[in-house]
Amino acid sequence: MDSVKNAAKAATGQDSQFTSGHQVPIQDMSQPSQQSDMKGPDPVNTEVPTEDGGYQTYRAAGKLKGKKAIITGGDSGIGRAIAILYAMEGADSMIAYLPDEQKDAEETKEEVEKHGGKCYLFPTDLTKRENCAELVKKAVSEMGTINILVNNAAYQNMISSISELSEEQWLKAFDTNIHPYFYLSKYALEHMKSGDTVCNCASVNAYIGRPDLLDYTSTKGAIVSFTRGLHNQQIAHGIRVNAVCPGPVWTPLIPSTMTKEAQDQLSATPMGRPAQPSEIATCFVFLASQDSSMISGQSLHPNGGVVVNG
């Protein structure tokens, strides 16, 4: 791991939070996880790296002006950063989250409004089909339409062997990580039109086959395939469907679901560090905007430099 960090530092000439200097503070958290309970450093939502190894506030350009988005898991982590950057680009959002995560959701709403956007809160359990339908109905009622669907919410729990992986956890992973993607896409697409987009959050694990996250990895592979199939259905209607496949990201999901040993390995990417949520959220801005007008059915790989050939 030291050689990876040294290589990253040598390549950049810097040692900052965004290069090789961002060390994960090992900690324990329970589920559902609260971003407000994380030990420092706080996840970064609105700043992006600069060439000199520092970072600056994200520079918006009105790329999503007037757009309306649904973002699942929008209370914290990647979802929170997406909601904030969407607001900076001119979009309003309705964020869905578990009822136990209300404090984080309120903080996201405050940040979104600080950057000029509207943020509608919808606490719910998306493993239930009827709640997915109600989320879409409420979004249309409050915002008037849906232009962007961000399927982002996820569950994971490390288990080292298939013999120890319970049937209940396997089902929970699929009920959380892929079934709502189907339900929400099915219901939201009834209200979407040409130029609108669906952005799904997959994972590098779908490509590397992480053994201690077998169920999670399987659902993320399903999301990649779902993205490709839905794209082939919807592209004739002018609706683009893409996925983002992050590597390790400093979010509440990490300390609440990973062992201390696993957390210690999060910097073992070619870049020598995990990502910040802001670095993943920029991909969701790109895919939701006209900057990516020629991209559909594809996956972006902000994974710290892991070559996946997929």
Where are these regions (language model features)?
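Amphipathic alpha-helical dimer-interface segment in Rossmann-like NAD(P)H-dependent oxidoreductases
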Residues: K137, S141, D175-D196, H231-N232, ...
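Residue(s) in the substrate-gating loop at a strand-loop-helix junction
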Residues: S203
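Active-site helix of classical SDR
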Residues: S185, T219, T227
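Catalytic Tyr-X3-Lys loop
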Residues: N147, Y155, S163-F182, C199, ...
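Non-catalytic terminal and boundary segments that flank Rossmann-like NAD(P)-dependent oxidoreductase
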Residues: M1-K65
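Short C-terminal tail/terminal secondary-structure segment
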Residues: I208, M271, V285, S296-G310
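Short, small/polar-rich loop/turn modules that mediate ligand/substrate recognition or access, typified
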Residues: I235, R240, I295-G297
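Conserved mid-core segment of classical short-chain dehydrogenase/reductases
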Residues: K128, A133, K137, S141, ...
